[in-house]
Amino acid sequence: MTQVPGVGRHRIAVPHQAEPLSLVSQDGIALAAMHLPNPSSSTAIVVAHGFGGAHDQERVERIAQLLNEESSVVAVTQRGHGDSGGMTTLGHREPMDVEAAVAWAREAGYDRVVTVGFSMGAAVVLRHAALLGPGSSDAVVAVSGPAYWFYRGTTPMRWLHRGISTPAGRAYIRTALGTRVDPEPWPDPPPMPPTEAAARVREHGIDLLIVHGDADGFFPLDHPRALHEAGPGSELWIEPGFGHAEGAIEEELVRRIGTWAMQGAGRGASPELSG
């Protein structure tokens, strides 16, 4: 095992087959990433973590390894997180980070690229595909993502908004999570909301899978249902007992997502778990 340098108690040793990558976003942010090749696959899955994550965080790397059983994987640490530069803009500029990983995969020769995002990363992969259209992603998977910006309807989200909105809160987040939050406010009007992004993804003819747990403590079920309704032809899996994002997802569900990513819409779902 090769140790990847970095701060944070959740970093782990990356397996020998992982190839460390140094990417640069369109606006010049240095991004840490890794490539897990699968010689039998011409598909690459790009993994976008949630707020506070990183590509070498244990729970993210576990997901990447499971997806790597069927496909190659490119996992990117988004700006303001881990060893990447810059500050997080909470989904505003992060589509450029995903595009850096997608572009690398295309240049590496992969025929298909599927983006899989968790929580904040779910909103990011939706906006990435919506903004860039056909030729960006061949399919999109949004796991535990929000449908609306500025949501404060649950206790965790109220605490998060309090944290990111004050200097003391941002300092605490940096100390506790190693995540640097940009103090600049979002533009007015704000970026394209996830529901509009889901609609555009489907208008572009890009396959879209929305995955959400009925035990999610951050975003209740009106969020995935709104995304599904906004994107006609999207697929919705409501997963019994699943909590929120990378920290709660079971291996079996990750493998089903990997199967869907490899085979397309309508594959990998269990009827009793699909909605």
How would you label these PLM feature ranges?
Residues V201-H204, I210-H212:
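Short beta-strand/loop motif that positions the catalytic acidic residue
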Residues M1-V24, I29-N38, E246:
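An N-terminal hydrophobic leader/cap segment in hydrolases
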Residues F242-V254:
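Catalytic histidine-centered segment of alpha/beta-hydrolase-like enzymes
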Residues F51-A64, Q78:
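The serine-hydrolase catalytic nucleophile loop
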Residues P134-P187:
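Hydrolase active-site cap/lid region
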Residues T89-A108:
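Alpha/beta-hydrolase active-site loop
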Residues L209-A215, P240:
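Conserved strand-to-loop "acid loop" that flanks and positions the catalytic carboxylate
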Residues A64-G85:
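Conserved alpha/beta-hydrolase
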